Amino acid sequence: MVDAASATRAIGIPIATLSAGSTPTARFHDGASGLTEIRPGTYVFYDALQVALGTAGADHCALSIATTVVSRPTPDRAVVDAGSKTLGLDRGAHSSNLLTDFGTLLGVEGSLSRLSEEHGILHIPADSPLAIGDRIQVVPNHVCSASNLARRFYGLRDGVVEEVITIDAAGGVH
């Protein structure tokens, strides 16, 4: 990108903005490359895909989906009220299928292995204490679709809501 911009400038065409990047490459931007801006899309939140790529650690993921257990049909299965409309169906960038589940469960042993539009199916140990009404957190595989539809973000610190942030651009893709 920088070489192409240099060649373009060399033939007399001015370039004021040189913009490139992605979340996995953001850490390599040192400010001296010639880029005037970078565009790391999920950098502000990170997600399960960035953890799988090694871009971030799980403790760097700043957004999770709060979902409620709505059914416990068998000892080794639970149903939550977050499905593909909330979590998305991504399992990796550009069909890479890096991830086998549809999100990362926080503080719960098990996997989120299937989604319908409105529900997620958890496979859990038969002796799991999860019960109907329990709230759990799921880090989405790809945070973009999850955050695009949200009307509010709840800022938590140590499990306590510290701030409610209204999202003015919720669903604003046209």
Regions found by a protein language model. Give the residues of each.
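C-terminal accessory subdomain/extension
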Residues: 74-174
